[in-house]
């Protein structure tokens, strides 16, 4: 009997540690996914020491100019207010000391905020709508996300180049994903795992309970027991 496509990968998991503790989502995973999200999470990682940082200091760390750093910090504060419903910003600013967290985020809130940031990106919305067949026209997508059609075109063209390296194409006009089914499934598996690592179930049209039961049957068939992280990856 042929083994499932992902059987060879279920014994490995992505691990990232910073300062001796596990970090759910590293900016390293995001270099090829979304530039703005990459810099935002890189900046969030910079505040894990709970210290004050000036825009100039942060600019050296993330290799941006100070103005861009300030822009991303302001955007993060707005993102946090939208995510949490709170009125205070994510960061507090001191003329001399620079920036620091207004309130320390607990680990659960931190993870949920990262998930919110990922799901809020145009790249994720594009990936979601195309692979789950909710993308109808460029105009409809642009209207749905309050962007211009030219911005939508630019995002799709950037993504097309990345997909081509996996042998996946987007059909002209309809933007339906084309390629070997196993490759498309593997691409979705890798992408969703790197972005969420089992923290949420991103497959809206698939019953999570059915997949859990299927994973149990697979483990029983191969007579293996996996820890929760590896089991979640198998389910993905």
Annotate each PLM feature.
Residues 6, 18, 22-236:
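A cross-family "folded-core" feature that marks the main globular domain of proteins
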């Amino acid at each position: 009997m042929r083994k499932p496509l992902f059987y060879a990968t279920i014994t490995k998991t992505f691990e990232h540690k910073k300062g001796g503790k596990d970090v759910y989502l590293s900016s390293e995973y995001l270099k090829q996914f979304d530039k703005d999200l990459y810099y935002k999470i890189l900046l969030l990682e910079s505040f894990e020491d709970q210290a004050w940082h000036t825009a100039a200091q942060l600019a050296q760390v993330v290799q941006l100019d100070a103005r861009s750093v300030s822009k991303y910090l302001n955007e993060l504060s707005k993102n946090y207010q939208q995510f949490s419903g709170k009125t205070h910003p994510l960061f507090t600013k001191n003329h001399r000391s620079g920036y620091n967290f207004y309130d320390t985020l607990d680990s659960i809130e931190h993870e949920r905020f990262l998930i919110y940031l990922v799901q809020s990106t145009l790249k994720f919305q594009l990936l979601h709508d195309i692979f789950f067949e909710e993308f109808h026209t460029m105009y409809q997508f642009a209207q749905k996300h309050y962007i211009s059609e030219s911005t939508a075109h630019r995002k799709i063209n950037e993504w097309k180049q990345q997909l081509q390296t996996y042998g996946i194409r987007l059909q002209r006009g309809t933007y339906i994903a084309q390629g070997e089914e196993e490759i498309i499934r593997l691409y979705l598996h890798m992408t969703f795992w790197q972005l969420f690592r089992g923290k949420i179930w991103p497959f809206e049209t698939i019953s999570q309970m059915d997949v859990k039961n299927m994973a149990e049957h697979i483990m029983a068939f191969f007579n293996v027991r996996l820890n929760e992280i590896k089991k979640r990856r198998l389910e993905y």
